[in-house]
Amino acid sequence: MPSFWTQISGPRLYGIFGQPNRQEPTLENLGNTVISFSAGIYYIASSLAFGPVILCYLYSRDWLTPAGMLTILKYAGYLTLIGYGARTFGRLFDETNSRFLDIWENEKNKKDDNSHAALKKYDFELLDVIPDFVARPNSDLWHLKPEVAEAGVVTRGLASWAIHAFGRHLIYPGSMALLKYMMRPNLNAARKLLVQNKNGQRLWIKSSEGDTLDAMFLRGTNQSQDLIICFEGNAGFYEIGVMNSPAQLGYTTLGFNLPGFGESTGLPYAVNTLAAADAVMQYAIQVLGYRQENIVLFGWSIGGFPVAWLASNYPNVKAVVLDATFDDLLPLALFRMPTFFSTIVEHAIRNHMNLQIDKLLARYKGPIRLIRRLQEEILTTAVDDQPENVRRATNRINWLLKSIIKDRHPELIQNLEPQVDRWLDMTPTERLMHSGVSLREESTQRKRLFDACNHYLIDFDANHVTPLDPQYFNIPHGRDTF
């Protein structure tokens, strides 16, 4: 039997793989609901965004006096007692939960060599688990240095406050507690299907930043020797994310949730995100046994950031596939924020969330494929009521395509950069018509430029969040000349 303290503070059990869906006992469910509600109140009250406002309100109502503070502590104590008390009593009379907590406690205290395998049969909140793999810090990894712009103390302070108070939540909404609470039932159900129906292997990987990553490995059905490592967007989860597209084609895939997403611990700051990506890469090479030459990096949306960084540090990877991504976060952030905040926004992005995918990819010279969403509504810098061709022309993946061609084939784009915009605006039929051979030197250069555009980018007629049709997932091959 688990200790009484483990019954109180142990992780929440969601279910058992291979068995019918678990229904929490009434008392346990009541306790978990109260605990989640209390955690939400604490999260809001202690946040940098709402905390100062709440403090001002409490001060105006004379709640910050000794008597007022005692009243607040009294009600907080009531919630704590009801939440943990109800949950504990519910667990005490639930044999399944007691058995799980006993295994979890033995694993935590390393009392039983078989407890780790036994624990993998359960789906639960990842609290104090022993990871399957611990990534080592690597001082040789290259990082894009922050662009420290000249700014006063006030600007620097406001920029730091903004990125920690609400900027991170806007950039990575998938880490918000409310969204995770709402998504938990769907993620649990999808994770169960991956393990039961697709023989998925759930992994716990610890990054060099100390975050525990929830990951999933799916063995493919085709004869390919390649591994597709999948990177989700800012509100994506491996359970219901981009891993499904290559998996449908029979590829072996490895997906994971970013720090703070799903059951992964931590928060998705840039350093944590990159440490997580490197930890997964280390696992693929050291444990799964894949060579760089057999690894394909596949990223959707903001997942292009860790993909580009990994490609710059592991230049021998087989290929990079980027779906619905962008060149630089700053233009998108400036477009969506009030103009008078522009200086603060620029300082916050460049010094705390410097997601410059184009500069990262400049260090990678291997095969790459961009997938542009024709109905893109997230990565554009045009208002919704503007014509479709205008919105399509402001898709930031267009700038990423130009950056790749400039880095790899500067002689093609020299004096012809507007022709890339022209090609991007063409229909597939128009592009085919311009693929003919011309004897004029300028036309020949333009044809070669269009060939390069065709090689690096394909269009997918969908909006930002539509799952990628598997037929658009093709591993690109390298090409040096056009």
Curated annotation (Swiss-Prot):
Annotated GO biological processes are: monoacylglycerol catabolic process; phosphatidylserine catabolic process
Q: Start and end of every AB hydrolase-1 domain?
A: 231-459
Give the Pfam families listed for this entry: ABHD16_N, Abhydrolase_1
Q: Check the record and name the InterPro entries matching this protein.
A: AB_hydrolase_1 (IPR000073), AB_hydrolase_fold (IPR029058), ABHD16_N (IPR054518)
Which superkingdom, per the lineage? Eukaryota
GO molecular function terms noted in the UniProt entry: monoacylglycerol lipase activity; phospholipase activity
Alphabetical list of Gene3D superfamilies matching this protein = alpha/beta hydrolase (3.40.50.1820)
Its name, as the record gives it, is: Uncharacterized protein F37A4.1
Origin organism is Caenorhabditis elegans
